[in-house]
């Protein structure tokens, strides 16, 4: 006889305990020397805030980002003059630094701009809501199907030269939909909704596919996290139904600054990455672009998608703590933060110590007042005076051959 409890709570399956993130399978899209999708690591990118006409300033901004781990750099291109300036930027990068994958950001009525800049960059980002921009009419309340299709044909005609150019150069395009700039006909037809964002992207994808061009990356950004998450999930659903496998660029647009801007970006980006959705990310902050890169890598590290720093496991401290946990964690971090790939646990007492740090490579645990127990994995190696804890931890790492000089 089946009980009520077993009906409401069926036995858990092995898959429910799977802690691995299973990434959505996508096609690889090459952007310069970097590959987006196709099972490659999630790519980190950002955008310089210098005026593109400032050649030296733009080159310096690109270098600053690239040197701290930004793998693709986007540059705004609001006019033809800016498009030709990118040729000089690329030339100077090659002469004074090294090749950096560059993306041109093209918006309002960008047909001629995009065609010119496609010669000088690795990828062109276009906004479907603005690429063929028509000023909204105050008295319009709807679009007939004929009117909708007529504009679609105009978009296809306008987009074709760029698609052919990128296809023939074997370069890439990002179809970058923004919730705040959906085309009027999409708004009237689908509303101010994730569906409207998805349909806007699909329209441009179909145009590209009709011209045998599939080096595409897609984004559906919004400043509200629930809208952004819903749009990407719906896009994946539609692409799966249509047999499309384009990689996705994740981001919360206009996230703001400071702690909240970082939390807001993480809430959207990490939610999707945890579901296996997303191939490249950008954290958009109202701060210097260089501030975005550590946030990107921290998100990827926290999810186990890329390991680029030491993973520190530390308890929040309580009345059982036998040393100043906050100070000691800072000391341990200062001494070991260059040992990329290690997991180091700092635990204030024996209650949380060995159990919570079981997966760590090394542990620093308060088990007795004035003394520190050092662990290798689950094994306690030695007990030392608290004043010698950090130096003895370093000695243990050195003895195992895992120490490198900073």
UniProtKB/Swiss-Prot annotation:
Family as reported in the entry's similarity comment: Belongs to the IspG family.
Residues reported to bind [4Fe-4S] cluster: 315, 318, 349, 356
Role summary: Converts 2C-methyl-D-erythritol 2,4-cyclodiphosphate (ME-2,4cPP) into 1-hydroxy-2-methyl-2-(E)-butenyl 4-diphosphate.
Pfam families assigned to the protein according to its UniProt record, in alphabetical order: GcpE (PF04551)
Entry keyword Metal-binding: yes
EC number: 1.17.7.1
Organism: Microcystis aeruginosa (strain NIES-843 / IAM M-2473)
Known cofactor(s): [4Fe-4S] cluster
Name by which UniProt lists this protein: 4-hydroxy-3-methylbut-2-en-1-yl diphosphate synthase (ferredoxin)
Species lineage: Bacteria, Bacillati, Cyanobacteriota, Cyanophyceae, Oscillatoriophycideae
Alphabetical keyword list: 4Fe-4S, Iron, Iron-sulfur, Isoprene biosynthesis, Metal-binding, Oxidoreductase
Pathway membership: Isoprenoid biosynthesis; isopentenyl diphosphate biosynthesis via DXP pathway; isopentenyl diphosphate from 1-deoxy-D-xylulose 5-phosphate: step 5/6
